């Protein structure tokens, strides 16, 4: 659990960063936010590669899809925080005696530093045979497909929204091809008006679809996460 200070204590502990010569004001504000972010501090303390780890922790605490023995695919997995959480929760290293041992496959366009208990592949998940490769690596179908992907920011909110929704829809299509019936799909979206297509698509394929803003998401961010559970299977939709 990440603890936040409040009231006078929070104001007294806040770090201020002076704007150095050559540093933009926006960069200074970003640095200040990082230095004062309890999730950034917690990630360093807990050994996670980024604050995003606490988003999947929040989501899994509520929906319980990362269970021991689960087979998980993490799309756009760099820098690896979600994979690190999944390794622990699905018992990928077999550290929980008497519990089933899960498997984690992480896919990303960029090469990554290894993560114990996770099989990383440098792959574009939009390739035509990506689903076949994933099922081959897993030795079967996945129980969970998850994505914290976001396209590179353009500075234009609607453009960024459309890009991330296109990524989400592509991720959902891969999930339809690799998920076991009863499986779960989790993906980040940005609010902006074009979520309807994805929602309709998921409601056809899953028994339940929820939209959640984890506590670890920044208050000023338009991001939220779609959690679709109870995959019906392609042929049953």
From Swiss-Prot:
It catalyses: uridine(2552) in 23S rRNA + S-adenosyl-L-methionine = 2'-O-methyluridine(2552) in 23S rRNA + S-adenosyl-L-homocysteine + H(+). One of its GO terms (molecular function) is rRNA (uridine-2'-O-)-methyltransferase activity. Keywords: Cytoplasm, Methyltransferase, rRNA processing, S-adenosyl-L-methionine, Transferase. Signal peptide: none annotated. InterPro entries: RNA_methyltr_RlmE, RNA_MeTrfase_FtsJ_dom, rRNA-MeTfrase_E, SAM-dependent_MTases_sf. Coiled coil: none annotated. Gene3D superfamilies: Vaccinia Virus protein VP39. Belongs to the class I-like SAM-binding methyltransferase superfamily. RNA methyltransferase RlmE family. This is Ribosomal RNA large subunit methyltransferase E. It comes from Jannaschia sp. (strain CCS1). The lineage of its organism: Bacteria, Pseudomonadati, Pseudomonadota, Alphaproteobacteria, Rhodobacterales. The gene is rlmE.
